[in-house]
Amino acid sequence: MIINAKGPASFAEKYIVRSIWENKFPPGSILPAERELSELIGVTRTTLREVLQRLARDGWLKIQHGKPTRVNNFWETSGLNILETIADLNPEGFPVLVDQLLSARTNVSAIYFRGALRNSPDTAVEVLGQIHQLEDTAESFAEYDYLLHHTLAFSSGNPLYVLILNGFKGLYSRVGRYYFSSPEARQLALNFYKELEILAKAKNYIDVPALMRTYGINSGKMWLQLRDDMPSSIAQQDGNA
């Protein structure tokens, strides 16, 4: 098992998570005793204990006082916060993960975009007004796109959508910088922003779902043209597009 880590705690965490992912510690199984596991990984018991607590908070493990530590089925117990970890564990499946991420984001964003234009049209107009000073670079578009989604999610009347976005912020930011490296993708997005601004100024939230659906289809086609050339480094938390 080859693991790149910045320190003992990071190494221990990645070792345990990868062992769970590769079914060496399958769901429902009991982890080795603390002393045995610390010797196996090569870290102190204090470091291991801290790592186990962190993994339990993320849903990978179940820790109960006086009982052995049990491995959870993370698909049932974890949240969006492990997306980064899954991307790191399964780089070969990363393009499919991104497909699923973008599909989920498109479906959810149609709800909070409509809600924002209905409940806070002035806020929508204000944030959309920034497109007229937007630099034609991948970084600027990726940053603005996230800002737009974050602002409209918060203004939709249901701030829980913001927490959903926060769950895959790092992953989406890296993918976004790659996606918006395409001039065609930037132009497609800019056209969408302009049409959305028109709806916001007219306080027309009724037509938002149709606009979102059209943009979702077109941006999906654009993504399919770009995904096969996506650098594998994007899957890593410190990867650069």
UniProtKB/Swiss-Prot annotation:
<keyword id="KW-0963">Cytoplasm</keyword>
<keyword id="KW-0805">Transcription regulation</keyword>
<keyword id="KW-0276">Fatty acid metabolism</keyword>
<dbReference type="GO" id="GO:0003700">
    <property type="term" value="F:DNA-binding transcription factor activity"/>
</dbReference>
<dbReference type="InterPro" id="IPR014178">
    <property type="entry name" value="FA-response_TF_FadR"/>
</dbReference>
<protein>
    <recommendedName>
        <fullName>Fatty acid metabolism regulator protein</fullName>
    </recommendedName>
</protein>
<dbReference type="InterPro" id="IPR036388">
    <property type="entry name" value="WH-like_DNA-bd_sf"/>
</dbReference>
<dbReference type="GO" id="GO:0006631">
    <property type="term" value="P:fatty acid metabolic process"/>
</dbReference>
<dbReference type="InterPro" id="IPR036390">
    <property type="entry name" value="WH_DNA-bd_sf"/>
</dbReference>
<dbReference type="InterPro" id="IPR000524">
    <property type="entry name" value="Tscrpt_reg_HTH_GntR"/>
</dbReference>
<dbReference type="GO" id="GO:0000062">
    <property type="term" value="F:fatty-acyl-CoA binding"/>
</dbReference>
<keyword id="KW-0238">DNA-binding</keyword>
<dbReference type="InterPro" id="IPR028374">
    <property type="entry name" value="FadR_C"/>
</dbReference>
<feature type="domain" description="HTH gntR-type">
    <location>
        <begin position="6"/>
        <end position="74"/>
    </location>
</feature>
<keyword id="KW-0678">Repressor</keyword>
<feature type="DNA-binding region" description="H-T-H motif">
    <location>
        <begin position="34"/>
        <end position="53"/>
    </location>
</feature>
<dbReference type="Pfam" id="PF07840">
    <property type="entry name" value="FadR_C"/>
</dbReference>
<comment type="function">
    <text>Multifunctional regulator of fatty acid metabolism.</text>
</comment>
<dbReference type="InterPro" id="IPR008920">
    <property type="entry name" value="TF_FadR/GntR_C"/>
</dbReference>
<keyword id="KW-0010">Activator</keyword>
<dbReference type="GO" id="GO:0019217">
    <property type="term" value="P:regulation of fatty acid metabolic process"/>
</dbReference>
<dbReference type="GO" id="GO:0003677">
    <property type="term" value="F:DNA binding"/>
</dbReference>
<dbReference type="Pfam" id="PF00392">
    <property type="entry name" value="GntR"/>
</dbReference>
<keyword id="KW-0443">Lipid metabolism</keyword>
<dbReference type="GO" id="GO:0005737">
    <property type="term" value="C:cytoplasm"/>
</dbReference>
<keyword id="KW-0804">Transcription</keyword>
<comment type="subunit">
    <text>Homodimer.</text>
</comment>
